[in-house]
Amino acid sequence: MEIRVYNSELDFLGIIENQTSLIWTRKYFEPGDCELHIPITEENLRLTRRGNLLWMKGKKEAAIIEDRKLEESDSRNEITVKGRFLSSYMDRRLIKSTVYFSGKVEEAMRQLLQGVTLIPRVELGELQGFADKVEFQATYKNLLVYEEKLGRSANLGFRFRPDFNEKKIYFEVYRGTDRTMSQGVNNRVIFSESYNNLNDTIYRENAQLYKNVAYVGGEGEGSARVYVQVGEATGLELREVFVDAKDIQSENMTSAQYKAALETRGRETLEGAAVSASFECDTGADENFRYQINYDLGDVVTVKKRAWGITEDLRITEIQEIYEYGGRKIVPTFGTAIPEKIDWSDT
């Protein structure tokens, strides 16, 4: 396996072939990341400068070098490189104008990217035509944070796909394929002990941060302030949260449009505070269902763990490709990973 290195202008710089470890983590709702370990050599020092790009042939993603550590001791002479995938360029941009949008989520994601300060070499990819709709207003928000929110709201993934021949980077929105047992259109994919592809399993579920009713406060003061409620529950099942949405202004909107924008903010908050449940496993040398042939990132598959009484249809939200000791290990995560905390500052 060779790792090709490019500069930020997408010019080819060289090849890394002497790595001891590479962890390439693809993520559906956010930029993926990587961690690379290589020996310290003059050539590797040249290639691993901050801002350079790492890419492997056939990949739809490339990683930006953001962190580099040099370590020398009696037992170690190593460079450790870490970075996020190209879509993290959006973390460098703000939505500075007031954007009011009512329409399809995919088109909103594309419009937000077009409305910020230009990211060099980035262009819109082909429009897929996903029908999911949204209504929202955003001002002075981080572009990447909002793209992630929109993607999660409609179960859409996104990426920056590099084309090193054209020296362009394409923003693509995509949706995984339904491969569950309950459907009959696509080839089914099942992860279970009987298929020997559910090894070293970890299952997590957590409701500590769960909220199911949001009270959203819009513009105005005191009794004149506009409020909307999103969600319903009673008794011990009721878990309430307040969302301050004064940044959403009613200018140039009807009353119905304004309340719809507040409701969208409330739904975003509840989506970020859902019950978390996830499977993580080592697929082993699975010959029944092969990665990127029978299934890929974003697909919805059936996961069965009979000993634990669990059978669920879950989306593959993350896939770790681990390259070590001359081999490759695939570790998918199914479902929603458990957040350490919820950041309410941008809701």
Question: Which residues does each PLM region occupy?
Answer:
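Extended Gly/Ser/Thr-rich low-complexity repeat segments
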Residues: L45-G58, D91-Y100, S182-E193, N294-D299, ...
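Oligomerization/assembly interface segments of phage tail-like spikes and tubes
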Residues: R26-I40, N77-S88, V216, G272-D286, ...
